Amino acid sequence: MPERERRKVLLIGWDGADWEHIHPLLDEGLMPNLEKLLERGVMGNLATLQPVLSPMLWNSIATGKLPDKHGVYGFMEPDPDNGGARPFSSLSRKCKAIWNILNQEGYRSNVVGWWASHPAEPINGAVVTNMFNQVQREPLRVPPGTVHPAERSDELGDLRVEPHELTAQDILPFIPKAGEIDQEKDPRLRAFVKVLSDCASTQAVVTQMMEDGEWDFTAVYFDTIDHFCHGFAEFHPPRQEHVEEETFELYKDVIRTAYRFHDIMLARQLELAGPDALVLLCSDHGFHSRHLRPRGTPREPAGPAVWHRDMGMFVMSGPGIRKDERVYGANLIDVTPTLLAAMGLPVGDDMDGRVLVDVFEKTPEIRTIPSWEEVPGDAGMHPPGTKIDSEWSERLTKQFVALGYVEDHSGNRDKAFESAETESDYNLARVYFSSRRYQEAIPLFEKLVERFPWEDRFIQHLIVALMRSGHSAQCLRLISAAYPGSWVPPNLAMTRVFAIQGAQGREAALQAFEAIPEQALAHPRMRRQVGTILSNLGRLEEAAVQLEQAVQDDTDDYAAMGELARVCLKQRRWEEAADRAMESVGRLHQQPTVHYTLGQALLRLGYPEQAAHAFEIALGMRPGMYGAHRHLSTLYAKQLNNPEGAARHHVAARELRKEQRERRASGTDDQRAKTWPLPEFPSPEERFATLKKERMSPEEQEQLKGSSGRSFTIVSGLPRSGTSLMMQMLDAAGLSPQTDGIRKADEDNPRGYWEWESIKSSEDLPELFNETEGLEERAIKVVSALVSSLPLEHSYRVIFMLRPLREVARSQSQMIARLRTTGSAQDEAALVEELKDHRERVLFHLKRQKNIKLLLVRFPHLVADPVAVCESVTEFLGEALPQPEALKSVIDPALYRQRSEGGSENENASGSEKE
């Protein structure tokens, strides 16, 4: 647009923010800055997409496209270069984000923290990626690709707020009783501080970037609300019955204070943007906070997403935007088209979103082009051949594992590759499924069911996709094969009734429905499905009762509202049908069947123009709706004086009718049965047993710990921390080592490494501990990176060696240099920080395990005062040590090389301690 029309545009993302949390705070006057924004603009719900996974959603927000077009299908993707898996990245995205489009038009942009934005794209402006929370400040270390331009890495990296820098003044507003928390048993405070420091870091960076340079567009993403909700929504008021009063009192204020903190940050962001800026604040989904909060997490990767609510929040404010108004029917794919229109730029016809014209005081001229992908010029994207930094990939993967979004396959690249490929296929299939492209979803679900016949989530999605696509007979065959008895899961019981109606008629469906146990239908989440079944079976009064209750349970349940509109239409309650349909599309616009219902109701009410508009909207989303074409043909011919439109829709209706007849005659179900033979399924009980084994719940993990009655002696620690010496000591004292002698003694370890090659893969540990004879009577050396993967069912006595980290780093570096392997040039100070973080995480884990007894042995004290340390080892191992007096016989101070100058971090600590 012309230079004189340019104004700053600020896009703010609050992941997981929900009006259900915000409205009470607004009513109490506790979010004054958001209140001011609302007074100057519009607000509304922002419908999410399926699956509700943040990397997919925020890239849809930034592109205006569904994930099958932008290419980000979840958290992890298969790594074709190195094997294994890597996080989805800016290189995974297949199309231009809004900042790439603006780059081509000469705009200057800031992008901070956006999902899958690493490595930073070379746009006109500045980018700080979602890798910024991995920055280390002491010493300063910014991962490559985190900041663009790279020369600003030190400047912006220095803004990183470390967790240890937060004080009680920062923490107590969120957790007033933080001082009462036993952090050895409760890890939540530690996790909370990490998330809060990340949030403060993002705010510091974005405000610095807004302050110190000319910019036209700034996009900033905060994950704090989402992370806090995943950690603490269970404790949000009102207290649930299963939540202990003491824990509730500790954490009940976290989420409320998080929103207030974001409101404080918002004030500074708005100040820097200026009064004439266009501001759009949104979230990608909501978060359950009331009676619909789940009691558990599904046994699947990305299981925590079950907490996500389908409605996020949306606020838009600035010159030309309506004031203090509500907007209905917005979807997160509408954000980019709306911003482009507001900036006077054309919208791509290939964008799945639409311009939210209702936000504007005066509807702007909406120009379109076929696709921004076809527009030449510098879009500030990575050149072909750009590679992913493997270190970044590994660090971010660990973060996803810690958050519960991906499975931990560290040490097994093949399994990591398979898991990433599986979840990407599953998520893509769900994109097709949720956008009603069942014929594209079905082959993906079929492939997944063939590979993983024990995964009910794949089986159930395939069953529903077959039913919705009209393959009723095949759907019933699949249900019978997967659930051979009379029992089926309650949600599939409804699907089975739908399929029976499609294959065998209404009477058979009615019998199947009446055979469903009443308790299976009583759950609030089942009311919508029950209402839909009753409507299909002609029991309209009962259907209306169920659907009304579903809407009362969840006032944003657009699907229940749409089905209720259909019931009202059948009951000839035209006005109520129109009202319910408008309420439904006001929450989610992309519902062609509900727009069709609205058109039917408006037609009955005597509004032909409005009815035609509703039918046209329905056809814009689903061109193959025979009824909409038929109605429009009649309306345009008889009431709206549009003979061309009438003829066009008449031809379309006739062609669709012909296709329907041909499809019925071709025997679609028989064809599908031939193309995809049903696999052999384990029984539901066997599938559940496999699922429990593959993905245990935290409660089951606790029950399993130590349950075998077997106990093992483990020596662990960082490489080069004294583990080999401890193995020698135990051998001298009569506790034989489990070693194969494959790794020979050398200059670095003249007396040998005392290692067991077979134990160097975490995937092999269960089999090794269960099948190796005599292992309980031996000492086993397990490196610190694997000690957290010990099989849960056994008990362990772990001797963990501690050595000053500077000594460990120097010893490792010199050993690597002598071996001439990779890594010898790594900065020692940076290595010390990495080792410190790793050791802290390992020890934190070990100290919290009820099946692990832990003895910490400090290497300098072992050499300086062997008698005292040997006494501690003797007491710790007890009868497992036949000749304890021989422990100190192998200690040779001459082998203590790479000593720290001027002492160490452990010099004031005792030589050993039990945990």
Where are these regions (language model features)?
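His/Asp/Glu-rich, glycine-adjacent segments
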Residues: 65-246
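Metal-dependent active-site segment of extracytoplasmic phospho-/sulfohydrolases and closely related
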Residues: 11, 33, 257-298, 339
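Histidine-centered active-site microenvironments of extracellular/periplasmic hydrolases
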Residues: 276-319, 352, 368-372
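Substrate-binding rim/cap in mid-to-C-terminal beta-strand-loop elements of soluble/periplasmic
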Residues: 267-270, 296-346, 362
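PAPS-dependent sulfotransferase catalytic core
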Residues: 49, 124-131, 678-775, 889-899
